[in-house]
Amino acid sequence: MEKRKEIILKARPALVVSVHLNKFSVSSRRGAQVFYKAGDENSHLLAESIQSVFNQMEESVRSFSPLAGDYYLLNCSEYPSVIAECGFLSNPEEEALLVTEEYQDKIAYSLFKGIVKYLAEVSYNPQIKG
């Protein structure tokens, strides 16, 4: 985790998206969920933008809301930060999707669309510090 923090601080990014895969004790759980830095408005907006695109994926079986999280990667810098949990490896059907290049491309494109949506929002809204 320290190495990731060093990379973030050295890069001085406009935002941070850390991509992960989830695991849960109940194997029927599936879908993508985004966590954001608690108390940070821009992180929350970024999470909402990405989550809304994830929820529109045809493979999505339910809509998630982004959740505030108290995780090291979210709190280690001043930049808007989210963790994108892109699916559940504990769900055999979703795991089968997650290993395919086609589904990985869908996830990557969803992340891209969510980031672009967020950047458009903060660029055009003078109330939001970008």
Task: Indicate residue ranges for each PLM-predicted region.
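Active-site-proximal helix/loop segments of hydrolytic enzymes
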Residues: M1-G130
